Amino acid sequence: WITRHTGEKFDPGFCGKGLACRSVSYAASMSPCCLSADERKALPELLRNLDALSVREAELAEMIRPLTEKEVRVVCDPVLLLTYEEWERRCIPVKRNRPYVLCYNLMRSEACMKQARETGKELGCEVVEITAILRLTKPGKYCLQALDPISFISYFKEATFVVTSSFHGTVFSVLFHKPFYVVGMGNLGGRSAALL
């Protein structure tokens, strides 16, 4: 439900508009949890299309409850629905010759990259960065930008240490019992703080 990804307005399909079937919103998320005046005005009509509604953040639930007559449930992130063993079975071997510190730097934080470099140096590990942001210059020797979901989780499973600016980076560190460091995420860090 983050409108900056959908042209600064809600995608009606996410709210079941125009679908000829039952529509359920499971574990919708919005980070940061804030609505503009236009979004607050548009959302009640869109929410009427849904047969059931759940969100990941308690803050989001409180924000949208006044906008709908439907019950708004708070549920866990879908990543947490699988156990360690279920995630582990999906993993594949990562082709790395040396132990590595994984830096999942979703927020493009220089502090995150700096912490990863320092931790790598301290542990004698190379630093592998996963980012969705195309970089013109790589901050480290290994910067991965196009991983499929299985490779993505496999890098967490095989890491020596994880440094992250992401909720899902935090979750996979916990699931795979990895030592980790979460770099401050400001007002986007509520879910990570709640998890920890």
Task: Indicate residue ranges for each PLM-predicted region.
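Aromatic- and Gly/Pro-rich donor/ligand-binding loops
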Residues: 1-45, 92
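Catalytic donor nucleotide-activated moiety binding site of glycosyltransferases and closely related
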Residues: 24-32, 63-64, 105-106, 111-148
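A conserved, positively charged/aromatic
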Residues: 44-48, 156
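A short beta-strand/loop micro-motif in the catalytic core of glycosyltransferases
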Residues: 50-57, 163
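Short hydrophobic/aromatic-enriched beta-strand-loop microsegments
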Residues: 70-78, 126-129, 179-186
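Donor nucleotide-activated moiety binding/catalytic core segment of transferases
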Residues: 72-80, 84, 132-133, 137-170
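Conserved donor-binding/catalytic core segment of Leloir-type glycosyltransferases
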Residues: 94-107
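Catalytic binding pocket for nucleotide-activated donors in carbohydrate/polymer assembly enzymes
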Residues: 171-196
